[in-house]
Swiss-Prot record:
This is Large ribosomal subunit protein bL12. InterPro entries: Ribosomal_bL12, Ribosomal_bL12_C, Ribosomal_bL12_C/ClpS-like, Ribosomal_bL12_oligo, Ribosomal_bL12_oligo_N_sf. Homodimer. Part of the ribosomal stalk of the 50S ribosomal subunit. Forms a multimeric L10(L12)X complex, where L10 forms an elongated spine to which 2 to 4 L12 dimers bind in a sequential fashion. Binds GTP-bound translation factors. GO terms for biological process: translation. The keyword Transport does not apply. Pfam families: Ribosomal_L12, Ribosomal_L12_N. Residues 102-124 are annotated as: Disordered. Forms part of the ribosomal stalk which helps the ribosome interact with GTP-bound translation factors. Is thus essential for accurate translation. Signal peptide: none annotated. The gene is rplL. HAMAP family: Ribosomal_bL12 (MF_00368). It comes from the Bacteria.
Length: 124
């Protein structure tokens, strides 16, 4: 019996972020492809207009865990929904992105929680 697309989607949907990262790396190695987004060149005269647009998607980066690593791990778990081991691995591997492609309010709240826990964080 073959696995259906729905079964694959359900399996991927139940994976943790760290497991998904490993899956993407395995696909890249097996099929010789890259999951990196391709850069698209905009129209030649759009450079001035692009600077005037407000950024709508932000990435929260954990730069440094600081002295109170336990509190930072708790904050990362709260922000991302990761398990204890995944959150600890993420904090130990800093600097790393914690949340990607989120709105400004969510990004600022996540940064505030990380800084209150004693970490150094930035928005990009």
């Amino acid at each position: 019996m073959a696995i259906t697309k729905e079964e694959i989607i359900d399996a991927v949907g139940s994976m943790s972020v760290m497991d998904l990262n490993d899956l993407v790396k395995a696909f890249e190695e097996k099929f010789g492809v890259s999951a990196a987004a391709m850069a698209v060149a905009g129209p030649a005269g759009a450079a001035g207009g692009a600077a005037a647009e407000e950024q709508t998607e932000f990435t929260v980066n954990l730069l440094e865990a600081g002295a109170n690593k336990v509190s930072v791990i708790k904050a990362v778990r709260e922000i991302t929904g990761l398990g204890l081991k995944e959150a600890k691995d993420l904090v130990d591997g800093a600097p790393k992105p914690i949340k990607e492609a989120v709105d400004k309010k969510t990004a600022e709240e996540a940064k505030k929680k990380l800084e209150e826990a004693g970490a150094k964080a930035e928005l990009k």
